[in-house]
Amino acid sequence: MKIVGLITEYNPFHNGHQYHIQKSLEVTGADAAIVVMSGDYVQRGTPAIMPKHLRAEMALKCGACAVFELPVCYATATAELFALGAVSFLDQLGVVDYLCFGSECNDLDGLTKIADILCDEPDEYTKFLKENLRAGMSFPAARQDALSSYMGISDCSFLLSDPNNILSIEYLKALRRVKSRIQPFTIKRMESDYHDQTLRSTYSSASAIRSLLAYSSSVLQTQQVTGETFENTPFSSILNELEDQVPKSCLALLKDYHKVLYPVYQNDFSLLMKYKLLNKTPQSLIRYMDVSETLANRIQNNLNDFFNYKQFCELLKTRELTQTRINRALLPVSYTHLTLP
């Protein structure tokens, strides 16, 4: 029996994810698909829009044979650590033969070549990288230009500009790092662009679906919905727009559990975060793994302007501190007392 492993977030599950499961089984010839999925927090450093058990149920209804939770320390980490944690998990299961991931380029050879360069760090590539950094380029731009120079191509941005291509490269690096016997495959992503907020026919991005669910929640703020009248509510009409975007079994779950188990948003934790930060000093904040001294001081200096969780993260942004990095750094402050010794 052959098993294909999938690394996912399903935030939320949609047609593109079902296609991923089905196509992965097809291209690998595997008999079953095993999923490693982020839990209640995702890689952007924010809560998943719905609980992990509901998302896992959707995956099981749509072709997955088993769903395992990726520990939160990896699920909310950088692309490199996210990939390393997930690949290590699949490798340690000891039953996974293939890893199949979606990419924009659908070019396994090209992705593998870049992954090998980043793993081996040949002297010529390292020289180009250091020169670019000394010239003041940001690390992503410096790395992209160094790879282009080393590989002898005019521009490799088509392989490094998309988040899914970047994750694909990190999966390939992780397979090498753990010396895994798992064989990689990639398939062309069918859904819209990662950041696309517009619903498309059949394959929409998770971002677009989250936006619609957020809008439906705002509608319900002034609506009293009961089970008997659900089909006649504005919310029912809004959610029915997803009929072509998510599998029927998932749409039924979305209708059943809206305002019961989901949606969950970053701002739902605003009071908790404000309370935690009011009880912290810069010295105590830097004990959290991803909180630098610079970020700790910015938190302290801007705390009086805290309006809500999301707004505060946006307020803390700088050229060097992206919002995603800030999200990841603050997340452990809100849910744990554990800090570095």
Predicted regions and their residues:
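Structural motif
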Residues: 159-164, 200-201, 315-326
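Cofactor-binding loop segments of dinucleotide-utilizing enzymes, especially the Rossmann-like FAD-
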Residues: 9, 38, 189
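Short, hydrophobic/amphipathic alpha-helical patches that form generic packing surfaces
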Residues: 166-177, 325-335
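N-terminal Rossmann-like or analogous alpha/beta NTP/dinucleotide-binding catalytic cores
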Residues: 12-19, 23-153, 157-158, 170
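Conserved small/polar residues in nucleotide/adenosyl-binding loops
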Residues: 336-341
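Extreme N-terminal starter segment of soluble prokaryotic enzymes
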Residues: 1-4
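Glycine-rich, Lys/Arg-enriched anion-binding loops that position phosphate/diphosphate groups
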Residues: 123-160, 167-306
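Alpha/beta-hydrolase fold catalytic core
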Residues: 307-315
